[in-house]
Design a protein with these regions (language model features):
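Short, non-helical or kinked segments that cap or interrupt transmembrane helices
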Residues: 90-110, 153-170, 341, 365, ...
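Alpha-helical transmembrane segments within multi-pass membrane transporters and channels
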Residues: 122-169, 221-228, 423-424
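Membrane-interfacial amphipathic/re-entrant helices at transmembrane-helix boundaries
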Residues: 4, 10-83, 119-134, 237-238
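Single transmembrane alpha-helix segments in multi-pass membrane proteins
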Residues: 43-48, 66-119, 145, 151-162, ...
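C-terminal transmembrane helix and the adjacent membrane-cytosol boundary/short C-terminal tail
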Residues: 219-233, 329-333, 377, 422-468
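Transmembrane helix-bundle core of multi-pass membrane transporters
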Residues: 173-328, 390
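Transmembrane alpha-helical segments in multi-pass inner-membrane proteins
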Residues: 147, 367-378, 384-449
Length: 468
């Protein structure tokens, strides 16, 4: 009797587990990705709830974290790390590592800033359109050169990547200090500063944000249909129609929700006033301050200046750059011979060489690509601050590696996704932003980040054992 009762009590649990397993199998959702999304939501809710207790705000749960403004800022802050994390995935998948990305970012940033401030601006004149174009090309070329140097030392001189990039971390950091002479190099060219999301011209606004969101939804639909067509062509198992519809709906809802959030963040009153005056936009009566010049200077005038005049920010240039880079690297990794060779080499280097893959050239190409991505991050970071220093990329290598590992990239090689790394970057930046917003001590923030990295590697080891 007791045996029958026990079996009966376990029946529903087994049925639920079986239903969940069937759902995951049908949709082919990665359990680690789902866990990371759940962790991200818990982090956001936790910071907002705790913030509501110690410092009430306008957030969803009474704090200051889950507000349109903070989410908008969070996405901008994540852009730089997310861009580098996409390249770090490919490097780790190949069973390599790059510890020099932080110092490389500093070197590229201060060199590009030095070129703008001390060479191009005096020669061409402040604001000349050739300044920002030359600076961007120079940054990409320098990043590619440094990345290529790392790749050559690793591939052809057979020096372990850990040693090469550890040396680069020190050497490139010293070179950055030498270029900047320990000073802050500023200001950047006005057009160049747009890459950091500074100013109204760097914000696409609500209309174009919704247009981009609609295009993204169409892209998700096309990607699902294309993948299904390819599966049918090569006689691979097909996902059920309901599973395909679920993936399209989930992706579309996520895109629309994020777009709604970024469109809900209005411009700062001073920025709105100045933009309206510079562009001859009518200002509603009673909005200007008593002096009549339209500039909000005193704190008690900020509310009055915001009345009747409102612009929404929408997506910013650095966020769009990060999304574009993520899409491009995802395409390279999954739809090109270059990407297939990377995963084949990471899965079994010896077999890859026997199959005719030039692993040495591939290594140089991957590290060169990493250098270009670091250069893009350097452009975003220095443009956002409108300045560059030799410690601009301090500890960035740790955050980038953490983002990749948290995103599901295996340190053993052969496994990793680009979107997972970008989600991992968002998780890491959420932790940093939340603890900073709540005035956590720097030591506490560092300890939390270190613990999260170790815990992520521990979970990766558990996952690999389970798969085996």
């Amino acid at each position: 009797m007791s045996t029958t009762t026990a079996t009966g009590s376990q029946g529903p649990a087994l049925s639920e587990e079986s239903a969940l397993t069937r759902f995951l199998r049908a949709t082919e959702l990665d359990t680690r990705t789902l866990g990371m999304v759940a962790a991200l939501l818990v982090i956001w809710a936790g910071f907002d709830i705790y913030g509501g207790l110690v410092r009430p705000g306008e957030g969803l749960f009474g704090g200051s974290f889950l507000t349109a403004r903070n989410i908008w800022v969070l996405l901008v802050q994540t852009s730089s790390i997310a861009v580098m994390a996409t390249g770090m995935v490919l490097i780790i998948v190949m069973r390599q590592i790059d510890l020099s990305v932080g110092s490389m970012l500093s070197l590229v940033a201060v060199s590009t800033a030095y070129l703008q401030v001390y060479k191009l601006a005096p020669a061409l004149g402040v604001g000349h359109p050739a300044i920002w174009i030359t600076a961007v090309v120079f940054a990409l070329a320098l990043g590619a050169l440094v990345g290529c140097l790392n790749g050559v030392l690793i591939a052809y001189l057979q020096i372990p990547s850990f040693i090469v990039t550890l040396g680069g971390l020190i050497a490139y950091g010293g070179l950055a200090f030498w270029v900047a002479r320990g000073e802050t190099v500023a200001p950047m060219d006005q057009t160049f500063a747009l890459f950091g999301g500074n100013g109204p011209l760097a914000w696409v606004g609500p209309t174009w944000s919704w247009v981009l969101a609609a295009l993204a939804c169409v892209g998700i639909l096309v990607a699902i249909i294309t993948a299904r067509t390819q599966r049918r062509r090569f006689k691979f198992p097909l996902r059920p129609i309901w599973a395909e519809a679920f993936l399209v709906a989930t992706g579309g809802i996520a895109v629309l929700l994020i777009t709604w959030v970024v469109n809900s963040y209005p411009w700062a009153p001073k920025v709105a006033e100045k933009y309206a005056i510079d562009n001859n936009i009518p200002i509603p009566e009673g909005v200007l301050d008593p002096s009549g010049d339209g500039i909000c200077r005193a704190a008690d005038k900020i509310v009055r200046c915001a009345e009747g005049l409102s612009f929404e920010t929408g997506y910013t240039i650095p966020v769009l750059i990060a999304i574009a880079v993520g899409g491009l690297v995802t395409f390279l990794a999954g739809r090109t011979r270059f990407g297939r060779y990377i995963y084949a080499t990471g899965g079994n280097p010896e077999a890859a060489e026997l199959a005719g893959i030039n692993t040495k050239r591939l290594t140089v190409m991957v590290f060169t690509l990493m250098g270009c991505l670091v250069a893009i991050s350097a452009i975003i970071s220095s443009a956002r601050l409108n300045a560059a220093t030799n410690n601009l990329g301090l500890f960035n290598e740790l955050y980038v590696i953490s983002a990749a590992v948290i995103g599901g990239t295996s340190l053993a090689g052969g496994i990793g996704t680009i979107y997972g790394a970008m989600l991992g970057a968002l998780v890491m930046q959420s932790l940093q932003s939340g603890m900073t917003l709540l005035n956590f001590d720097t030591a506490v923030r560092d300890m939390v980040v270190g613990f999260v990295l170790v815990f992520a590697v521990f979970l990766d080891q558990l996952y690999r054992r389970r798969v085996k």
